[in-house]
UniProtKB/Swiss-Prot annotation:
Originating species: Chlamydia trachomatis serovar D (strain ATCC VR-885 / DSM 19411 / UW-3/Cx)
Name of this protein: Uncharacterized protein CT_031
Biased composition (Basic and acidic residues): 65-91
Region (Disordered) residue spans: 65-100
Family from the record: Belongs to the chlamydial CPn_0121/CT_031/TC_0300 family.
Domain of life (superkingdom): Bacteria
Amino acid sequence: MARKDRLTNERLNKLFDSPFSLVNYVIKQAKNKIARGDVRSSNVAIEALNFLDLYGIQSEYAERDDRERHLSATGERRREQGFGTSRRKDPSLYNWSDVK
């Protein structure tokens, strides 16, 4: 591994909020590789960090995507049940003097 490619604590701290998020990300990557049948004898943590560094992806984006998927699924269920998340204002409640 060249000096440029070495992973240091500073680089890890920049990529991940905490060591727990790093571990959770690596576990998720390992599960995905096992499910795909792509199991290698190399270190999955190093592969994941190299991938993140190569494409400039940070773990917060993956966590944000998971949250957005969960929220959109929750919103879909509410819409199916008839609970709208948006509140519509009745235009008859306003006078022209209220509009600036």
